[in-house]
Amino acid sequence: MPERLAETLLDLWTPLIILWITLPSFVYMAPMNQAHVLTTGSPLELSRQSEEMRILNRSKRGWVWNQMFVLEEFSGPEPILVGRLHTDLDPGSKKIKYILSGDGAGTIFQINDITGDIHAIKRLDREEKAEYTLTAQAVDWETNKPLEPPSEFIIKVQDINDNAPEFLNGPYHATVPEMSILGTSVTNVTATDADDPVYGNSAKLVYSILEGQPYFSIEPETAIIKTALPNMDREAKEEYLVVIQAKDMGGHSGGLSGTTTLTVTLTDVNDNPPKFAQSLYHFSVPEDVVLGTAIGRVKANDQDIGENAQSSYDIIDGDGTALFEITSDAQAQDGVIRLRKPLDFETKKSYTLKVEAANIHIDPRFSGRGPFKDTATVKIVVEDADEPPVFSSPTYLLEVHENAALNSVIGQVTARDPDITSSPIRFSIDRHTDLERQFNINADDGKITLATPLDRELSVWHNISIIATEIRNHSQISRVPVAIKVLDVNDNAPEFASEYEAFLCENGKPGQVIQTVSAMDKDDPKNGHFFLYSLLPEMVNNPNFTIKKNEDNSLSILAKHNGFNRQKQEVYLLPIVISDSGNPPLSSTSTLTIRVCGCSNDGVVQSCNVEPYVLPIGLSMGALIAILACIILLLVIVVLFVTLRRHKNEPLIIKDDEDVRENIIRYDDEGGGEEDTEAFDIATLQNPDGINGFLPRKDIKPDLQFMPRQGLAPVPNGVDVDEFINVRLHEADNDPTAPPYDSIQIYGYEGRGSVAGSLSSLESTTSDSDQNFDYLSDWGPRFKRLGELYSVGESDKET
């Protein structure tokens, strides 16, 4: 009760204090306290010094100061009086002038230069500027000479409660875990007040909650927000809106206030166990489904979110634990049941599983709420499907000897239809795996037989694929790999491992090893190779060489004596019989060539006679000489024939089947000849119509331009063409009517559109069958011979 009375009295006195501050009568204080009055002592004494300069000589300081105050935001009809300047040197004769300078002098503060009164002519705001520093000085009214040194003073702006609190960082967001205990700190907020925190209670703030109760509370002075209720459940309500108020003047009436909002979100904790939506699930699956296929999904719902809702799924019981598995889908938060092993409808038609869902992240604070897991039953029904045949073995390994008879049985494969309605099976070989068709199979019983002979030395293994097909449904097929190993038999005789050539020194010693040889066998006996070496029966008593078997299955050839002479015999041939240990044993004879060479004293071969080179075909030197002689003789005959052919005179008589157009005829033409198509053409000038290259056809007979004379009779067929041309040339040269060589001669123009076309051999590109020369008979007797020639060529061609 006393505290409430004190607050009431404070609320009543606050307006009175503000009014007392603003009264002008209190701004100017009485001279006894010298609050806002400046006074001076004795008058200014003036004295003269050298150079007639006057200086001020003050007996005592005349200014007395206190700070001046002015209330902010004051807006009256008249400028507010801040204070008054006064000096003791002012007797009231109005001969002293007061000057004010500094912050705001002349713009904010104005002084009466006679009375020294200072007024604020503008509205002041403490939040913009809290104090002003000015300089005061008293000068002579007439001379403006200072009577006292300048002095500084401060005018402070007194604060009033004109600013409301503000939340600069609002609105706010905060989180707090659900199920938190009472008084759990959520966050804290801060408001600011621009008023003076030192003077009065204008900046003293008190916080309160306007909205958000009874869930949250706030401490009035620190603004810390706490939970006001325990065990708030996120699943019931996840988000809360809290309205917070900050009020100045200590929260009393008349104070200014500001508000902000705080959004509080409850974060999730694992306080809920998973729960299956149903206790029994039914799924069906065909028996031929591929391993790893998803059969179905089960899901346990959890009201929590994030990692608190994550659950792991397991199969904990049932008769199909070996055939099925369950995996957790973290994205969908469910369990996926997949096939682990093949199913067989004929063996078992249904399975029962018991699955469990358990939270992964457990919060021990809520373990008392029970186990965070749940179980459900899954019923899986297997559906019948038409399955492909099943072989009795996934792979087959067969063995056969390489000398096995054709059509002999190598082995057998078996397969069955696993369905209830069993279908007969037919077998076949995938020929892509048996391109050479070395094997066959019985389509009914699956027996594999040999089709072509085998050779282990060519291929030891044969891998084929057998196909089993249902007769009732050809789309149901199965394949099985069959590996056939070819077993070895002794069918190859041993022989030298390489071609050997031994060298024997003439000065060699008896018992000296000439050469060491080894043998090889393409067969592969189980116990390895063991070779027997011997000489031919007729070479057993060989006087020159002997053999010795070594422990490493090789053979050494030794000399029996010394004194070999390459002049007497240069090469020795030693046949060696090599036998294997097979059943039956096989043998072969290999010949070792031994050359006698000249050697140094230390046994180094220096020279050996070279054996005459023998052609691979076995021809002797005499046969070679005979062959070369025959070739040279043939070449001589050919050269003689060509030479005689060149000197032979061939007749120039035109044969009946010869075409005269195939002969090149020379003309003595003016100008550039036939090739000169750009030369001067008098016929073109005489016929302007032919300028464009198209002349009208004129069928006229040639006119005689010379005196009549007796000519020779037409030349009969078969006459010599050379003689005929020479006669005609002689007549032309001796013709007195012929024009001179330097005159312009006019020839019959045969241009484009002429029936005859060009008579040049170079332009005769068409075949004889495409041309008709019957019109030549209409040109007169002088062209009769030409017509006969062409007519003869055409008739001969037809015959």
UniProtKB/Swiss-Prot annotation:
One of its GO terms (cellular component) is synaptic cleft. Residues 643-799 are cytoplasmic. Residues 62-167, 168-276, 277-391, 392-494, 495-616 form the Cadherin domain. Residues 62-621 are extracellular. Gene3D superfamilies: Cadherins, TCF3-CBD (Catenin binding domain). It comes from the Eukaryota. Residues 30-61 form a propeptide. Residues 1-29 form the signal peptide. The keyword Acyltransferase does not apply. The chain crosses the membrane at residues 622-642. GO terms for molecular function: beta-catenin binding; cadherin binding; calcium ion binding; identical protein binding. SMART domains: CA (SM00112). GO terms for biological process: adherens junction organization; calcium-dependent cell-cell adhesion via plasma membrane cell adhesion molecules; cell migration; cell morphogenesis; cell-cell adhesion; cell-cell adhesion mediated by cadherin; cell-cell junction assembly; chemical synaptic transmission. Keywords: Calcium, Cell adhesion, Cell membrane, Cleavage on pair of basic residues, Glycoprotein, Membrane, Metal-binding, Phosphoprotein, Repeat, Signal, Transmembrane, Transmembrane helix. The modification Phosphoserine is found at residue 795. InterPro entries: Cadherin (IPR039808), Cadherin-like_dom (IPR002126), Cadherin-like_sf (IPR015919), Cadherin_CS (IPR020894), Cadherin_Y-type_LIR (IPR000233), Catenin-bd_sf (IPR027397). It is found in: Cell membrane. Glycans are attached at residues 188, 463, 473, 544. Its main location: membrane. PANTHER family: CADHERIN-23, CADHERIN-8. Cadherins are calcium-dependent cell adhesion proteins. They preferentially interact with themselves in a homophilic manner in connecting cells; cadherins may thus contribute to the sorting of heterogeneous cell types. Three calcium ions are usually bound at the interface of each cadherin domain and rigidify the connections, imparting a strong curvature to the full-length ectodomain. This is Cadherin-8. It comes from Rattus norvegicus. The lineage of its organism: Eukaryota, Metazoa, Chordata, Craniata, Vertebrata. The gene is Cdh8.
